[in-house]
Amino acid sequence: MKVYSCFICFDMKNNKRSLFILKCLMEQSDEKHLVTIANINEYLRQYDLDANRETISDCIKELQEVGYDILCVRSTQNQYCMRERSFSLAEVKLLVDAVQSSRFIPEEQSIELISKLAELVGSHKGEILKRQLYIESRAKTDNPDIMEYVDKIHQAIIENKKIKFRYFEYNANKEKVLRYDGFTYTLSPCVLVWNNDMYYVVGIYKDKEGYSKFRIDRMCDFELTEEKGTESQESLDMSDFFEKEFSMMNGETCEVELLCENKLMGSIVDKFGIDVNTEIVDAEHFKAIVDVNLSGNFYGWVFASKGKMKILTPEWVKSEFQEIVNSYAK
């Protein structure tokens, strides 16, 4: 039996019955699907509870008095529904889409999590969400322990404890191979980061200066230790670490002038923000002056434009990009 967290704050005189009436309204009603007292009584019988019309009506009034938005449509047989919820259908749909598209969450756990999210809007709207469900398992991770690892890492951060784990990669045969012959890492985790559809833990590794990051879906043999974690080094700039590690990676920072076709303005704004420095060149082109980390990611991003974006300055960056392009023709 699932019990909603909001039940904890209740101190109703007829306790159990009132709680299950609320549960019935949350699960089985919405503005388009109202329930009668007979429906509610039928629901109560599933839990070996029973009540007459007057008792159920009194319980609903008490629920309304403590703030639940329960609509009553009066007729010869009154009908009720839970009108307002903590999350709207659109809000839950956004959360469902995020879970659905996340490569980090395994397929089986994605379906389970989406089912729980669907309960937030009641059974009728929840079924609509489930019918629209599409999980592309090909792109999902196959590590079933991720949720447990996330929970333990979060606990380690709160309690300032170290974690231990081994880390795997894939060989040419697509087989999992432990890094460094099964070496066990010990990390003082500082923060969990979701970036580019992957989940990372960032922390302090041994006596290494600065922060280190590890993909959680590549961990195995995970252990939450009782060892006190290393205090976060205040002199280190975590925002600078994020900028270098999670943007265009660890290249040299440089101001670059790009010539772009107008249709790429959306991509430029997405990458650099609405305040990016741009200038109209002609009816079909604009220039963008941006600060980037010169790395394979940046050059790959320019290359992916298929000639619709060109590097104008500096000349040495332009030449370096051309050398990369020429290397593909060899």
Locations of the language-model features?
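Short, basic/aromatic recognition patches that contact phosphate-bearing ligands
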Residues: 1-98, 180, 327-330
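Short, surface-exposed charged micro-motifs
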Residues: 69-71, 189-191, 277
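General beta-strand recognition
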Residues: 79-81, 164, 200-202, 287, ...
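Bulky hydrophobic/aromatic content
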Residues: 88-174
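Loop-centered beta-sheet repeat module
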Residues: 154-205
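Flexible linker/loop signature enriched in Pro/Ser/Thr and Pro/Gly
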Residues: 207-239
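Polybasic (Lys/Arg-rich)
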Residues: 238-330
